[in-house]
């Protein structure tokens, strides 16, 4: 079998190259052909082989391979609705790792994925509770890739939130810190219960994640990003996170509170994002039932 040729080191180099190139060509050409290849070889396939096949693809056709990874990221988030579904723990673990949780999905509206500890050391959990998430949906995903030094990925997540007793207490506390006497910047009583109950407790939010080439001395994407020992494909990037909400008091915090207003727009540099789990949902058919459409990787 072709995959066996990849795994037996005693075979001649020309034979290995031929087998690897054949697998690579099929895997990076389209989503449908990638799944067909992995289904045909599922008995012998593992993450190490996926990384090696994609690394070979990167060395022969870097742009097509990166577009394959980005297409897998987009498909998993938008079409498979990874953030919205109730995930089977064992299937999730097969793609993302046994110790991973839903908060580890990149991106999502969680303390970890928002890098709140970077911006709010010591109070990151409180900031996360202020934006109480009940539901989140990936509402937009676009990307363009020219080279490791010229690319952009834009992902928009819409959230439905509801202020509960915990988040209400935190919002009040932050608002009271804006000025003395519990008055907000508009002079109104910031702890009026009517602002946090009933329908007014519900709100929507939009989080826009923009990924661009890394700065600050961080390495750009290369063949070294395909890391077999850690079972990861590390995508280095800066990420800008912009936030808007529909709630009056949250917006007041985003505009006037010295701490919370940092949430409105933040730039985080030199971060690493593992794209392998999104691609292995194709390999292992982790979230079945699941239909792959013949989307060419270079079309976004």
UniProtKB/Swiss-Prot annotation:
UniProt-listed Pfam families: Lipoprotein_3
Lipid-modified sites (N-palmitoyl cysteine): 20
Signal peptide region: 1-19
PROSITE patterns to which the protein is assigned, alphabetical: PROKAR_LIPOPROTEIN (PS51257)
Main location: membrane
Compartment annotation: Cell membrane
Sequence similarity: Belongs to the MG439/MG440 family.
Protein name stated in the entry: Uncharacterized lipoprotein MG439 homolog 5
UniProt organism field: Mycoplasma pneumoniae (strain ATCC 29342 / M129 / Subtype 1)
